[in-house]
């Protein structure tokens, strides 16, 4: 650390101060660096071996001394303690306990004339006397502070006691906990420009509510004690094809919506050929969605081109196209002669399927507020492309999180007229109306609340990720559900699975994703599930456990397709952190030479597709494969035993969850902007 003409550094031999201009030693002080107490993992390992846990090494990649300089004092933090020394001669002024975050160095801050550390005590810099102690009420649902350093501004102490980003005012007793917003391990959040920036979230604690990606947040209410709220103000615009619905319903051989049906099963009852060849391939732009198929038409959107296409199912020729007011992030839904879809611009559209003429467009939010998302302007309340049809009602959600921008608005519309039948704002929930304290879930490091996603349903129960609804959009508790349903912990459209994300079949998102153990249910990167049988593709070990052999396991063995069957709920629900929800049995496992990006199933075949992961790959090869630079691979498998029937190669990688099956053919969207039809050879 440098202050004016003084440079101070800490080594294993002690604390040294030198002249910053010429390096001459001004003083040295022996400051012992005590070994850290053993970590939980080290203690457990020693216990298994019948040994006494020993202290950790002096330094590690995560924990090292902290130095902070003022004009006349140097503050040194080591393993949860802080020592103040004179910058002039190194004499000790005072020492005190300070605490430290999970597996991180001791924090020392100088703000508002005081010295602060993790214990929220403001000390006199010269004497160490505690002058002010901040109070913090919400310290969960996470069981420990995050594994990164805290931050401070001239007004707030920022820590992660709740597991997220918590603001504690330096004067008074104001507290603003945000357990739904954390940052990347080791990096921490960054307060700047009147905003809070956080990096990508790579964990599973509070995964149902935690913001993902790189975000910039600000206080939209203009008042730290008041929540930002919105109200629903429906606006319906009628087009030239208004009122002309009532066409033919989709058949069982079609694939009329995302993942075949509102259950999002990814399974069709139809059969396919067991040897395929390319029938046609067409370019639809830069970033196609998964396709859907109804009758003699294929519908697919160019996400970044804001354009929906209708293609001829026999030859791939374009029949019509329609440009929306924002990105279309997922495929449309066919319903009785109509095509319905949402956009990231915040609108929902209904088109006549035959020619793409507009029937109506709907927007339910009170203002057109735009933010920047991945380099493009879009609504603060975006709508996913895939609209769910249930009981002649079109359901969708507008928004991102129940803790952002006033919450998520959920709607149910008449698909023919666009008339609003049901609506609800989902915000928080918070403990009361007077302060913004989110409600903690009963266990497993979770919050009440949710993030927006493509809606699904099973029976009469509707789902938006972990949040359930009745058909009239009255919220339901997970423990009251009568059925299990397909759940994607990062969201259906998240195309970057990490070592702690998973898809599963359950009532709620749980910590651990069943650890990937059969008997505890499916937990792959993507899943096809028809209510009885499931097929899942894995590239990571679910639950982050390498089964059996730990670090000796060949990582390529993790890339597999698994199939199992569901045997009912059992006598009671397992509410542990590592659940066994229902009775599951393994059917077969087939190792694959690729990391899976998509899986779907027909009565007789299963197709899994992804990017190559081959023996001998270097780190550079692996990165290039994930970037789509090594093309794509698909395996056609026998649904009954997992036997490989055929390998297909593509010039480009398949898009995430980008396969449909209809009328005996497979339709695959690729990252080079093309759609491929594979039919009987």
Stretches with model-predicted labels:
Residues 1-681:
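Noncatalytic, solvent-exposed loop/strand surfaces
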